[in-house]
């Protein structure tokens, strides 16, 4: 299986994890095993558990991690606590999440994530459950608008949702290019003339809805944080503002000492921070990485201990 994946922000991730060769580590998003392999190579008596909900990724990661102290499990990272408990692992010394859609999922047109090639409108990372076509052909205009606005930050959400409802009344919307053309027809001409494809926010929003990505991230962060050993590190790579905002707010809450109202002059809560921020500001790709890996352009890495 062709599965190209250049790991984003690899060295900053390895530095952030502060790997102990005897430690236990979790990669919640195995993908093409780019990060997983480099983590596992640095372990001696330690162990790596790699998770991914995509069966294609699991097959590739299993092959690429052969001979290394690593185990791959097909599951969404929101189930990390359960998986670790079943494996008899009480805590991990570090965990990594590389969020969003993988290069393989984008490059494989048949998966239906890309608006650059015609394919069935699928977008399921796990290849199970309702597809993107199911959503766009069944949800009412109000719900479609909410998804496009909340998950895509799409300024023309109402107009696009209206075009989708009108188009599907004539024939089902079953392919990626069908949807991309509907979006293009719904936005003002000035939007269509811009360098970025006008469908990009719609595709992001529907993908997030199909895969419940923000719910999974919210639950997964809590689950993984609770599995960290004292001094354990959590590294999270985000690719859009919705993910990054969620991660930033979680990290800040965990690192916060006082929870008293801001107008209260003296602390009475006796709060103790659960963690400390290793990165006050997110780490982004340097010029060398940007030149060799286009996917790294929007990547932001945050690290917590």
Regions from the PLM with identified roles:
Residues 1-305:
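S-adenosyl-L-methionine-dependent methyltransferase catalytic core, i.e., the SAM/SAH-binding region
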């Amino acid at each position: 299986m062709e599965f190209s994946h250049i790991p984003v922000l690899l060295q900053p991730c390895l530095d952030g994890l502060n790997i102990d060769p005897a430690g236990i580590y979790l990669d919640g998003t195995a993908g093409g095993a780019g990060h997983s392999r480099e983590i596992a190579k640095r372990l001696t008596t330690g162990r790596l558990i790699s998770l991914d909900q995509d069966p294609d990724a699991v097959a590739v990661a299993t092959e690429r991690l052969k001979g290394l102290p690593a185990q791959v499990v097909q599951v969404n990272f929101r189930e990390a606590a359960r998986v670790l408990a079943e494996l008899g692992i009480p805590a991990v010394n570090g965990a990594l999440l590389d969020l969003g859609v993988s290069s393989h999922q984008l490059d494989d047109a048949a998966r239906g994530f890309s608006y650059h090639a015609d394919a069935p409108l699928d977008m399921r990372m796990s290849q199970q459950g309702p597809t993107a076509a199911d959503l766009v052909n069944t949800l009412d205009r109000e719900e479609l608008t909410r998804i496009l606005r909340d998950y895509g930050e799409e300024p023309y959400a109402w107009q696009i949702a209206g075009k989708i409802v009108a188009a599907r009344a004539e024939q089902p919307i079953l392919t990626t290019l069908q949807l991309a053309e509907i979006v293009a027809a719904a936005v003002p001409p000035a939007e269509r003339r811009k360098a970025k494809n006008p469908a990009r926010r719609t595709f992001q929003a529907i993908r997030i809805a199909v895969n419940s990505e923000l719910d999974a991230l919210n639950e997964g962060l809590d689950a993984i944080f609770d599995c960290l050993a004292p001094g354990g590190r959590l590294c999270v790579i985000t690719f859009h503002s919705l993910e990054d905002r969620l991660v930033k707010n979680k990290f800040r809450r965990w690192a916060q000492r006082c929870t008293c109202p801001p107008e209260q002059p003296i602390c009475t809560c006796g709060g103790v921070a659960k963690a400390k921020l290793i990165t006050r500001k997110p780490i982004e790709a340097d010029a060398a990485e940007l030149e060799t890996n286009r996917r790294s352009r929007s990547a932001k890495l945050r690290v917590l201990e």
